[in-house]
Design a protein with these regions (language model features):
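Conserved, mostly hydrophobic/aromatic
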Residues: 6, 18, 65, 78, ...
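Short, well-ordered coil/turn segments that N-cap beta-strands
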Residues: 11-16, 61-64, 87-91, 134-138, ...
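Active-site mouth loops of central-metabolism enzymes
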Residues: 24-48, 107-121, 148-149, 253-256
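Short, acidic/polar
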Residues: 42-57, 115-132, 179-191, 261-265
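A short, structured active-site edge motif that brings together acidic residues
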Residues: 89-103
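Active-site groove signature of glycoside hydrolases
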Residues: 128-150
């Protein structure tokens, strides 16, 4: 597995990381979820699934894992896995604050998470994350930051973040929506006491939604780590999705390359020279194994799949939690 540095001064990480959004809670917005999980979505079942993924990922050389306070029990599962293994000290953990999980382990809950980017939420969730992850936490990110949230003008919040940065914690942002580029550029400008506050960004970039690419390239050129999420567009670029199914232009391109569409979608991300890490959101070891083939998959000429950003995000927003 190819290794890189997480930004200017961060730890070494693998170029493919594992995200636990899909397995830390019973409901999410990914394609094919009912078939992937079936009806057994108890906390014990998802813990075992998460541990299997972590074991397989670590054995394959993955050295970055992505969690969040809002991913149900993802941080808890990860901390228990660390304790059970007693090793894996070189696995770098990035987490996020800003959303609180309120789904109550109920797939049908009308609200699964609540967003609040206030200083009090940051302090509370940092304590919660730190209690579980401790010194293994290397990167803490504002979850789904937008310019409209006002967080970048909240001086109390910025001061609280800066206090933790001065203790050696890397700070980053994640962003979402059609205005990702604006958020990245605005966050890049934030300095506290003459020092840039953030050092990384996690954003959506995929063959259906590449609009943030220029801003992400600028951030990378400026020394930031760039982590890419939703490389398979929540399943749309897999064999089960509308854009990756057999017989579609992208499905045909994957077949010609001798890989599954998910592997080719991740390979397309890795081919961008400004990408530090691309996240696998695999829900099973088989999916992870397929995703990891991206690291050895050459990317030739691919069909043009890009949608208008507003259209892409409207489609994503309409997806049900299942």
């Amino acid at each position: 597995m190819e290794m890189v540095t997480l930004g200017r001064d961060g730890p070494p990480v693998s170029r493919i990381g594992l995200g636990l959004a899909a397995t830390g809670r019973p409901a999410y917005i990914t394609t094919h979820r009912d078939a992937d999980f079936g009806s057994d979505r108890t906390e014990d079942a998802l813990r075992q699934r998460t541990w299997q993924l972590l074991d397989a990922a670590y054995a394959a050389g993955v050295r970055y894992v992505d969690v969040a306070r809002s991913y149900g029990s993802a941080e808890l599962f990860l901390s228990q896995w660390f304790a059970a293994r007693g090793d894996a000290d070189d696995l770098v953990v990035g987490s996020k604050w800003g959303y609180t999980y309120v789904g109550g382990w109920d797939v049908a809950a009308p609200v699964q998470e609540v967003k609040d980017l206030s200083p009090s939420t940051f302090e509370r969730q940092y304590r919660e994350t730190n209690a579980l992850i401790g010194d293994r936490l290397r990167l803490y990110q504002v979850h789904s930051l937008t310019v409209e949230s006002g967080a970048l003008e909240n001086t109390a919040l910025l001061a609280a973040l800066a206090a933790h940065r001065s203790n050696g914690l890397l700070l980053g942002i994640t962003t979402t929506g059609p205005a990702q580029a604006d958020t990245v550029r605005r966050a890049f400008e934030v300095h506290i006491d003459g020092v840039q506050l953030f050092s990384s960004v996690q954003a959506t970039w995929n063959l259906l939604e590449p609009s943030a690419g220029p801003a992400l390239e600028e951030a990378h050129s400026g020394g930031w780590a760039v982590l890419v999420k939703e490389a398979v567009a929540n399943g749309r670029l897999t064999r089960y999705g509308d854009a990756g199914a057999p017989g579609t232009p992208f499905g045909n391109a994957a077949a010609a390359a001798g890989v599954e569409p998910d592997a080719l979608a991740l390979a397309a991300v890795l081919a961008q020279p400004w990408v530090t890490v691309v996240l696998s959101g695999a829900a099973s070891v088989d999916q992870l194994t397929s995703n990891l083939r991206a690291g050895e998959t050459p990317v030739g000429v691919l069909p043009s799949l890009a949608e208008p950003a507003a259209q892409y995000w409207a489609t994503r927003s309409a997806r049900p939690w299942t």
